Design a protein with these regions (language model features):
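A contiguous, low-structure linker/loop signature
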Residues: 73-145, 168
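Active-site loop segments of alpha/beta catalytic cores
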Residues: 1-39, 101, 133-387
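A generic structural motif
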Residues: 57-62, 126-130, 386-387
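Intrinsically disordered, low-complexity segments enriched in proline/serine/threonine
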Residues: 8, 25-28, 57, 65, ...
Length: 387
């Protein structure tokens, strides 16, 4: 068989069309930030050239977070919205307090922002001390804020980036779900879970404030001819505390809508959930998801690659399954080799259906010999059984 390009190899694996070998495409952003100070695509391509792997890139042609986060540029929000923002330093953090005035009402929030590279790690998450939304009475103001933000940041050109990457990478349009860093960052998840039983209509309306612009952005990128839509949907994860029933009732219909929209334009759909997947993976197959990441193994996750393959059959490609902490960071080249061999044996089929990937980003603490061992093992064991 003629050697495939990275883009061809990834597409063949996702479509079960017989790649020349198992694609290798780990998440690298933490390692890249620590060792090079950037996670930009061109830096990723340099790693790919050195270590011979297959870049699976996501590109945001518009805002993936559909409302202004603290310390944003508010200048384009328009005359109807005014933001007052104060900051103060406290230890290794910055405390940002905001008052956002809209024609429909006033919203307030307070966020603790840790310093990147400090005691909380290379790229720490913000800690929200006061959420923007207090209850249903704030929905009109939130809706105006989201509409103003997305209008000020329309979907731009993704086609040029895809063409620039060419055969060197498979590029997906990057989106975040209506909940992930969107509704889940303006209203606490714990309160939302309780509200599902006490005032479901409020939760549905809150999610749809973000789902509508998400769908509009998805349509806009699909009209540019993207080959794949990538959606991070980890706030919905079983690991966040949701039940399978609530997932089916609340989130699955909205994910299905984005899947079906992508498919109408001929684009593949890639769903990202780095938590527990045993209960939701059958639902993803049910609605036609083409590729699922990251299949985090036990004990953090709750499904093995062998179990995931049984669920996915030959209709859904799997990406991930290698533990970045216990296997890659804290392991040895020999144990990494064994884990990669086992993963490919469990998840790959003669037609493809598996991308050798990681449970999340390879960590900044990973020894160089372990980093290199992962890619060498992928090449060593990547010839598909039966081919």
């Amino acid at each position: 068989m003629k050697e495939m390009t990275p883009r061809e190899r990834l597409l063949a694996a996702i479509r079960f069309q017989g790649p020349d070998r198992v694609p290798v495409s780990p998440r690298l952003w933490r390692y890249m930030l620590a060792h090079g100070g950037t996670q930009k695509a061109h830096a990723y391509l340099k790693y790919a050239a050195e270590f011979d792997f297959d870049p699976l890139l996501s590109f945001g042609a518009g805002p993936v977070i559909l409302f202004p986060r603290p310390q944003s540029d508010y200048s384009k929000l328009g005359p109807g919205i005014r933001v007052e923002e104060t900051t103060r330093e406290e230890g290794d953090c910055r405390i940002v307090t905001r008052t956002l005035h809209t024609p429909a009402g006033t919203l307030t929030d307070r966020t603790r922002i840790p310093r990147p590279g400090g005691q909380f790690g290379i790229a720490p998450n913000n800690h929200i001390e006061e959420y923007l939304l207090k209850g249903p009475e704030d929905l009109p103001a939130l809706r105006q804020l989201v509409q103003a933000w997305t209008a000020a940041h329309p979907v731009g050109d993704i086609r040029s980036f895809i063409d620039e990457m060419g055969s060197r990478a498979l590029v997906a349009a990057n989106t975040y779900s209506a909940l992930s860093h969107n509704a889940g960052d303006v209203y606490p998840l714990e309160a939302m879970m309780i509200d599902c039983f006490e005032r479901r209509a409020f939760v549905e309306e809150l999610i749809d404030v973000f789902h509508a612009p998400l769908m509009a952005a998805t349509k806009a990128v699909c009209e540019q001819g993207v080959e794949m839509v990538f959606c991070s949907a980890f706030f919905e994860s079983m690991s966040a505390g949701w039940s399978p029933q609530l997932y089916r009732e609340l989130f699955l219909p909205r994910i299905r809508a984005q899947v079906e929209l992508s498919h109408r334009y001929g684009a593949l759909y890639h769903l990202y959930d780095d938590g527990k997947l045993a209960a939701t993976l059958p639902m993803h197959r049910e609605i036609g998801v083409d590729l699922v990441s990251t299949l985090t193994p036990p004990p953090t996750g709750d499904i093995t690659l062998g179990q995931a393959r049984q669920v996915a059959g030959n209709r859904m490609c799997l990406n991930g399954g290698i533990d970045t902490v216990n296997t890659i960071w804290r392991g040895t080249p020999a144990s990494i080799d064994a884990a990669v061999r086992e993963a490919i044996g469990a998840a790959a089929t003669p037609e493809g259906g598996y991308i050798l990937g990681t449970s999340d980003s390879i960590t900044e603490e990973t020894p160089p010999e372990n980093f290199r061992a992962f890619f060498e093992a992928g090449r060593r064991h990547g010839l598909l059984k039966g081919r």
